[in-house]
Amino acid sequence: MHCPFCSAVDTKVIDSRLVAEGHQVRRRRECLLCHERFTTFEMAELVMPRVIKSNGSREPFNEEKLRGGILRALEKRPVSMEAIEKGVNHIKSCLRATGEREVASQLVGNLVMDELKSLDKVAYIRFASVYRSFEDIREFGEEIAKLEK
């Protein structure tokens, strides 16, 4: 890695440690020419599958869209941002674990519902009512009854 201070080509790693629950490596480096020290962070670049929408169109996976939908469902609910980020990362891991280049939007929606069910039941019902297009109060009641079992 080039030195950010003098642009020298040679640097050496002084210290390496795992951070971000083991998903990132923090490296402390020293330039062999100017002896300045600096920190770098390294993480795997993982490709997310494309999403096949219900109308048949395809689009790249959009993490912000995923996070936005979850945040909307959890609005004014007592769930920490840390728990939300863990949920987003869990959904992304599940999608990558399929090993597929493309996944149906229904799979993404079902993963979101599963995650919301474990985070907050009210948010789950909010999301389910939109995702499953509830038509009347009876459908809300049926979904709530399933949760109470």
UniProtKB/Swiss-Prot annotation:
Note describing how the cofactor binds: Binds 1 zinc ion.
Pfam families, per database record: ATP-cone, Zn_ribbon_NrdR
Keyword Zinc in annotation: yes
Domain of life the protein comes from: Bacteria
GO biological process: negative regulation of DNA-templated transcription
PROSITE patterns linked: ATP_CONE
Zinc finger map (unnamed): 3-34
Keywords tagged on the record: ATP-binding, DNA-binding, Metal-binding, Nucleotide-binding, Repressor, Transcription, Transcription regulation, Zinc, Zinc-finger
Positions of the ATP-cone domain: 49-139
Cofactor names: Zn(2+)
GO molecular function list: ATP binding; DNA binding; zinc ion binding
NCBIfam families for this protein: transcriptional regulator NrdR
Biological role: Negatively regulates transcription of bacterial ribonucleotide reductase nrd genes and operons by binding to NrdR-boxes.
Family, as annotated: Belongs to the NrdR family.
PANTHER family on file: TRANSCRIPTIONAL REPRESSOR NRDR
Protein name from the UniProt record: Transcriptional repressor NrdR
Natural source organism: Aeromonas salmonicida (strain A449)
Gene: nrdR
